[in-house]
Design a protein with these regions (language model features):
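Sec/Tat-exported extracytoplasmic proteins
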Residues: 51-55, 63, 76-84, 111, ...
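Extracellular/periplasmic periplasmic-binding protein-like sensory domains
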Residues: 33, 114-183, 194-197
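Second-shell loop/turn segments in exported
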Residues: 32-38, 49, 58-66, 104-109, ...
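Extracytoplasmic ligand/sensor domains, especially the bilobed periplasmic-binding protein
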Residues: 1-85, 129-144, 152
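Segments of small-molecule ligand-sensing domains
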Residues: 170-242
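A short, well-structured beta->alpha microelement
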Residues: 83-100
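Hydrophobic alpha-helical
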Residues: 3-12, 105-128
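Solvent-exposed, polar/charged alpha-helical surfaces in well-ordered, non-transmembrane soluble domains
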Residues: 7, 11, 45-49, 53, ...
Length: 247
């Protein structure tokens, strides 16, 4: 469901059953409507938490003006104290990345592939570690070469590959993130139905759910914690170097 549809569906069922929405707009969440989309906050927390574990202290977060970019940078700033990071924010001006007069430990560029590629080329010789999100994934050989060494938070590609093979064999074409989320949502509903726990309490079970888009555990406020893989492009492939639990 979209954000608008989620609100309407939540009102229509009036709490009789939980509503899973595929939106990544955290504003629609409440005690009966659960945001199941991959959110900017989840991705930002995952990559920044990993960066902190690797010794990063000072981060410059780049707001590119897109909804995802703005929300990611805002989420990063909100997590600053919790992660013991110092996070400054730079707003993209005229499409140009900020000049790193005093380089931070890391540059967080949550936006799409083109911007991350530009940042990677700019930061390559500066000693600054580049941090990115699933939005940066790009499988073109020249892009993989440019992204070499970048830390990226993404749903686990191995999980997705297994789903994608099955999807393609049955339906043709290659599935996207929405198809994977839809499959996961249907699988969760089926699991709850089979256990006769198709209720809010069932959805909030401590064990969570093993999904194509990562292990998830739902919270009572309508959000969910999602596991992420940390990927690093090396020698033309994305290498999984760590897992982030429950971002």
């Amino acid at each position: 469901l979209s954000a608008a549809e989620a609100r309407a569906a939540g009102a229509a069922v009036a709490g009789r059953v939980p509503v899973l929405t595929l939106t990544n707009d955290s504003a629609v969440r409440n005690s009966g409507t659960f945001v199941f989309g991959i959110t900017p906050g989840q991705a930002a927390s995952a990559i920044l938490g990993y960066a902190r574990s690797r010794g990063v202290r000072r981060v410059l977060a780049v707001d590119d003006g897109t909804p995802w970019g703005r929300a990611s940078v805002a989420a990063a700033k909100m997590a600053e104290a919790e992660l013991s990071l110092s996070i400054d924010i730079a707003t993209l001006t005229g499409g140009a990345l900020p000049v790193l007069a005093t380089p931070p430990d890391a540059l967080f560029v949550p936006g799409g592939s083109a911007l991350v590629l530009a940042a990677a080329r700019q930061a390559k010789d500066s000693g600054v570690q580049l941090l990115a999100t699933v939005q940066a994934l790009d499988y073109r050989p020249d892009a993989l070469a440019a992204l070499d060494g970048v830390w990226i938070a993404s749903p686990d590609p191995d999980r997705f590959a297994t789903f994608a093979q099955s999807y393609t064999a049955r339906n043709g074409g290659r599935p996207g993130a929405i198809a994977a989320l839809g499959y996961d949502a249907a699988s969760i509903a089926r699991t709850l139905r089979d256990a006769d726990t198709l209720t809010r309490e069932g959805l909030l079970g401590e064990s969570g759910f093993d999904c194509v888009t990562g292990q998830v555990r739902f919270r009572s406020d309508g959000s969910c914690a999602r596991d992420f893989a940390i990927l690093v492009p090396r020698s033309g492939v994305y290498e999984k170097v760590a897992e982030s639990r429950g971002a």
